[in-house]
Structure formats: C-alpha cells, structure tokens
C-alpha cells in the first residue's frame, strides 16, 4: 500500500456557497463521494485538483450555469463521473486515459482478475458499490464511489 498517496475525504470539503444545492438538500460532505474519488485519483497522478474543483465540473455547465443533470437524490450518477472526467481532460488539459469496467454482482469474478492486474501495474480505479439492496457489501442505501489503488 502506498502510504504517500493523498487521501481526500468528502467530509472535509464544502459547497455551502452554492444556493441551488441548499434548495435540493444536496451537499458534498454527505453525497460527494464521486467528485472526491475523481480528485483522489487525479491529485495522486500529479494534478493540482481537489473535490470542490471536480464537483463544480459536474454541477455547472460549460457556460457556468448550475445544472443538476448529473445529480441524483443522494449523490452523482455514473454519467456524471464520465462527464466530469471528459471535461477535465478537455478543459484542464489533463492528459489521462481511462477504462470503464462493469462487474455484474451476480458474477463478480468475471472482471476481478482484470482489476487486480490493473492495480498491480500501478493504476487506480474508481469503483461504485451498492446500493445496499443490490450488494450486501455496501453500507449505503444509495451506493458509494471509492478509489482502489496499490
């Protein structure tokens, strides 16, 4: 395990200045695991970024207008993660590539070796577990994004 990695925690960041989030009772501290996961990967690849930066890429459109397209009741939907990465790659000139690997919980071993191989080669992954109704491994009724790495 690489103990020198930066490990942002979503509870340490706030978007209290965004009035639209107050109106829909959404906050980074409770529901920001997706933006925090993206920031954790990118900061450990050497990019200067934090969860507030990534959350704002999801929450505001390219014209700077608040846009809740990628929000769900208690978090960010999976399209929001991809949208954020694509915006960061294009707008912030972040030179990365990524793969999307979906694992069916009814057959989890199908991609497990692929993920293990990627980790052994120094890659990091953002994974989504849950919601708890679908996966007994999740503590969250809404699911949770997290980063796995060496």
Feature-to-residue mapping (PLM):
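Active-site-adjacent structural segments surrounding the nucleophilic cysteine of cysteine proteases
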Residues: 1-78
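Conserved active-site-adjacent core of cysteine acyl-enzyme catalytic domains
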Residues: 53-150
